[in-house]
Amino acid sequence: MSRKGSTPQRTVLPDPKHGSETIARFINMVMQSGKKSVAEKIVYGAMDVIGEKNPNAIELVQKALDNVAPAVEVKSRRVGGATYQVPVEVRSSRRMALAMRWLIDSARKRGENTMPRKLAAELLDAAESRGGAIKKREETHRMAEANKAFAHYRW
């Protein structure tokens, strides 16, 4: 850890098409090997697919992210010779990062034929509280609930 204090939060410019900082972060997380134009095509393609069914795609993406974002997670804490899984609250910036990561990972595992369709299907499912990303959040919450007895080890 840094001794000089916390690092400042990096700012992300809003995306050019929708003017949304959330969509810009989402594009950056979809990006692999620095190929931003490919990531933009994937995200905008997914939003076009969503737009066919729902006129306001940005609101649906935001709803999906809110549904997937975890409230608590477990962190390992070593006490004596034992390692405990201690439940801790998730701060807001990490909540969004985890939600985006889980949505993208779940979308990549789906069976649809193209990545924009996979991402669109996962976002639609997440907005309706179902799908792989929601399962991941539920699993995380279950782990925190099961280890609630160790909450006093919080740091």
Curated annotation (Swiss-Prot):
<dbReference type="GO" id="GO:0006412">
    <property type="term" value="P:translation"/>
</dbReference>
<dbReference type="InterPro" id="IPR023798">
    <property type="entry name" value="Ribosomal_uS7_dom"/>
</dbReference>
<dbReference type="GO" id="GO:0003735">
    <property type="term" value="F:structural constituent of ribosome"/>
</dbReference>
<protein>
    <recommendedName>
        <fullName>Small ribosomal subunit protein uS7</fullName>
    </recommendedName>
</protein>
<keyword id="KW-0689">Ribosomal protein</keyword>
<keyword id="KW-0820">tRNA-binding</keyword>
<comment type="similarity">
    <text>Belongs to the universal ribosomal protein uS7 family.</text>
</comment>
<dbReference type="Pfam" id="PF00177">
    <property type="entry name" value="Ribosomal_S7"/>
</dbReference>
<comment type="function">
    <text>One of the primary rRNA binding proteins, it binds directly to 16S rRNA where it nucleates assembly of the head domain of the 30S subunit. Is located at the subunit interface close to the decoding center, probably blocks exit of the E-site tRNA.</text>
</comment>
<keyword id="KW-0687">Ribonucleoprotein</keyword>
<dbReference type="InterPro" id="IPR036823">
    <property type="entry name" value="Ribosomal_uS7_dom_sf"/>
</dbReference>
<dbReference type="GO" id="GO:0015935">
    <property type="term" value="C:small ribosomal subunit"/>
</dbReference>
<comment type="subunit">
    <text>Part of the 30S ribosomal subunit. Contacts proteins S9 and S11.</text>
</comment>
<dbReference type="GO" id="GO:0019843">
    <property type="term" value="F:rRNA binding"/>
</dbReference>
<dbReference type="InterPro" id="IPR000235">
    <property type="entry name" value="Ribosomal_uS7"/>
</dbReference>
<keyword id="KW-0694">RNA-binding</keyword>
<dbReference type="InterPro" id="IPR005717">
    <property type="entry name" value="Ribosomal_uS7_bac/org-type"/>
</dbReference>
<dbReference type="GO" id="GO:0000049">
    <property type="term" value="F:tRNA binding"/>
</dbReference>
<keyword id="KW-0699">rRNA-binding</keyword>
<dbReference type="InterPro" id="IPR020606">
    <property type="entry name" value="Ribosomal_uS7_CS"/>
</dbReference>
